[in-house]
Amino acid sequence: MQKSNLYSKLLKSPDDAPVFISEKLELDFISHAYSLGLFPWTSNPVTWWCPSPRMVLFPDEIHIQKSIKKALKTYEIRLDYDFALLIKHCSLRKKTWINQEFIETYTKLFEQNLAHSVEVYENDEFIGGLYGLIIGKVFFGESMISLKKDASKIALIKLCEILKPYDFLIDCQVPNEHLKFMGAKEMIKKDFLKILEKKVSLESGFENFQNLL
């Protein structure tokens, strides 16, 4: 089935319920699923979602609080430095469905240069960050963590800064006030899938994410 036909089918999928369920994460299927607008939300079994509205962020629309501007100059940002450490910390949060299968699968995606991380350090100590997948000109955000106040915000601001020249879209998945305050907006499924279909078909514009700093 052509991709455009799959997008049409997803337009009719549930807005606030899983599109389908799978017993496990299939490595070869994941990037295809993301490019169609699907993402996994739970494990055992894995539920795949394409909600509406969708939360998205255009890098040039990021809001930077005055209180964070100083921290941006204080903390060190590293890209793809210790993906395993970041995803491990994300899995240790009280409310998370990130299990060992998820960690192993996304670590393999990192090794395949599909998953990427933005990490924040203070005095060489990890204090937070975020990770997601890059397909075409879309960064599909998966999870973020702050071990120190505003660390995840700093990671997101830095992500926007480095992706802005490449005309990227950041998929933030489901709406929340934290991201809305930072400039993210809600987009209905029809509009999201339309821009997604175009963006994932383009080249990212860079060869190595780690070298964007």
UniProtKB/Swiss-Prot annotation:
PANTHER family tied to this protein: LEUCYL/PHENYLALANYL-TRNA--PROTEIN TRANSFERASE, LEUCYL_PHENYLALANYL-TRNA--PROTEIN TRANSFERASE
Organism expressing this protein natively: Campylobacter lari (strain RM2100 / D67 / ATCC BAA-1060)
Keyword annotations: Acyltransferase, Cytoplasm, Transferase
Membrane spanning stretches: none
Function as written in the Swiss-Prot or TrEMBL entry: Functions in the N-end rule pathway of protein degradation where it conjugates Leu, Phe and, less efficiently, Met from aminoacyl-tRNAs to the N-termini of proteins containing an N-terminal arginine or lysine.
One MF term in the entry's GO annotations: leucyl-tRNA--protein transferase activity
InterPro entries on file: Acyl_CoA_acyltransferase, Leu/Phe-tRNA_Trfase, Leu/Phe-tRNA_Trfase_C, Leu/Phe-tRNA_Trfase_N
Pfam families: Leu_Phe_trans
Enzyme Commission no: 2.3.2.6
Family per similarity comment: Belongs to the L/F-transferase family.
Cross-referenced HAMAP family: Leu_Phe_trans
Keyword Cell membrane carried by entry: no
GO cellular component: cytoplasm
Subcellular location: Cytoplasm
Biological processes annotated in GO: protein catabolic process
Identification of the protein by name: Leucyl/phenylalanyl-tRNA--protein transferase
Gene: aat
Key word Transit peptide present: no
Catalytic activity field: N-terminal L-lysyl-[protein] + L-leucyl-tRNA(Leu) = N-terminal L-leucyl-L-lysyl-[protein] + tRNA(Leu) + H(+); N-terminal L-arginyl-[protein] + L-leucyl-tRNA(Leu) = N-terminal L-leucyl-L-arginyl-[protein] + tRNA(Leu) + H(+); L-phenylalanyl-tRNA(Phe) + an N-terminal L-alpha-aminoacyl-[protein] = an N-terminal L-phenylalanyl-L-alpha-aminoacyl-[protein] + tRNA(Phe)
